[in-house]
Design a protein with these regions (language model features):
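Active-site-adjacent beta-strand/loop module that shapes the phosphate/pyrophosphate-binding cleft
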Residues: 72-93, 120, 124-126, 130
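Short, active-site-adjacent segments that bind or coordinate small-molecule cofactors and metal centers
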Residues: 126-145
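Residue-level detector of conserved catalytic or cofactor/ligand-binding positions
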Residues: 146-157
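Conserved N-terminal beta-strand and adjoining loop/helix that marks the start
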Residues: 1-17, 38
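Conserved Nudix-box catalytic region and its N-terminal flanking loop in Nudix hydrolases
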Residues: 16-51, 149
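A short coil-to-beta-strand element that immediately follows conserved catalytic motifs
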Residues: 60-68
Length: 157
């Protein structure tokens, strides 16, 4: 199982979103996603998060929260465990991203963007105001979402 991170960076009621329009043969082509990527050898999720955000945006995170785990199962690729974060503190200025166009989008409008169907599921969990950690499994067949597990919530002390 591969490990990835995804972060929704917040500022003034908006999330920083990445419109994937620059890479060829990109499974995310044309979609809007948060910032993140694959963990490198021996990286913790937090190390991966900070590195990926810096590489893709130029920003250095100063305040972030681990919000949930998403297990992706697909008949076309290796299973993925995605660590979902939100961040509300950062330093630096946005840079040009070689994977797509970065844009600040009103949080309420994000689920209406062209995203993966499963992304809308966990985006709605984040936007619900519920603060507890979540875990959910999303199963895809090709590009179609065929199963969504009931999200579990955990209080972390």
């Amino acid at each position: 199982m591969i490990t990835t991170t995804l972060c929704y960076i917040e500022k003034d009621g908006k999330y920083l979103m990445l419109h994937r329009v620059k890479k060829h043969n990109d499974i995310n082509e044309g979609k809007w996603i948060g910032v993140g990527g694959h963990a490198e050898n021996q990286e913790t999720p937090e190390e991966c998060l900070v590195r990926e955000v810096k590489e893709e945006t130029g920003l250095t995170l100063t305040s972030y929260r681990f919000r949930g785990l998403v297990t992706f199962i697909s008949n076309e690729c290796e299973p993925e465990l995605m660590c979902v974060f939100t961040a509300d503190g950062f330093t630096g200025e946005l840079i040009e991203c070689d994977e797509g166009e970065l844009a600040w989008v009103d949080k309420e409008e994000v689920p209406e963007l062209p995203t993966w169907e499963g992304d809308r599921v966990f985006l709605n969990l984040l936007l619900s105001g519920e603060e507890r950690f979540f875990s959910i499994k999303l199963k895809y067949e090709g590009l179609s979402l065929i199963h969504i597990s009931e999200p579990t919530r955990h209080s972390l002390i």
